Amino acid sequence: DHEIAAAAGVPIPTIFEMEGEQGFRSRETAILKKLIVLPHIVLSTGGGAVLKEENRALIRKSGTVVYLHAPPETLLERTRCDNSRPLLQVADPLAKLRELYAARDPVYRQTADFTVESANCRETVQTLLKRLSR
């Protein structure tokens, strides 16, 4: 999302306001195409990036894909004070996160080479280092 906002010159909520989610997703694909050709990068995509088949194909071609899994309740804690997430600016953000999770979790699992639970930062890093060094 950072790269999308930087390229657009405006924050993500402004892109959503002006172009809607569809416009944002188009920008997301364009940025992915630019980033995946860079050597030796760690690419952290936005939550909805894998919903588009074209993006999934791009991501899979770029290298090892890791799904950093967290349940909706954990995601709410992590995003509670983040006003830059247009899809969560609703009356019940936990319900929205559960809805997004139900739709996205199977796609993330299908796209990823492996999944890592991301509840504890230190354990997540240790698991990633072990898995990626194989």
UniProtKB/Swiss-Prot annotation:
Keywords assigned: Amino-acid biosynthesis, Aromatic amino acid biosynthesis, ATP-binding, Cytoplasm, Kinase, Nucleotide-binding, Transferase
One Gene Ontology term from the biological process aspect of the record: chorismate biosynthetic process
Keyword Cell inner membrane: no
A single GO cellular-component term on record: cytosol
Similarity-based family: Belongs to the shikimate kinase family.
Pathway listed: Metabolic intermediate biosynthesis; chorismate biosynthesis; chorismate from D-erythrose 4-phosphate and phosphoenolpyruvate: step 5/7
Reaction equations catalysed: shikimate + ATP = 3-phosphoshikimate + ADP + H(+)
Keyword Nucleotide-binding: yes
A Pfam match: SKI
InterPro entries: P-loop_NTPase, Shikimate/glucono_kinase, Shikimate_kinase/TSH1, Shikimate_kinase_CS
Principal localisation: cytoplasm
PANTHER family hit by this protein: SHIKIMATE KINASE, SHIKIMATE KINASE 1, CHLOROPLASTIC
GO molecular-function term, one example from the UniProt record: shikimate kinase activity
Gene3D superfamilies documented for this protein: P-loop containing nucleotide triphosphate hydrolases
Organism: Neisseria gonorrhoeae
Protein name: Shikimate kinase
EC numbers for this chain: 2.7.1.71
Annotated compartments: Cytoplasm
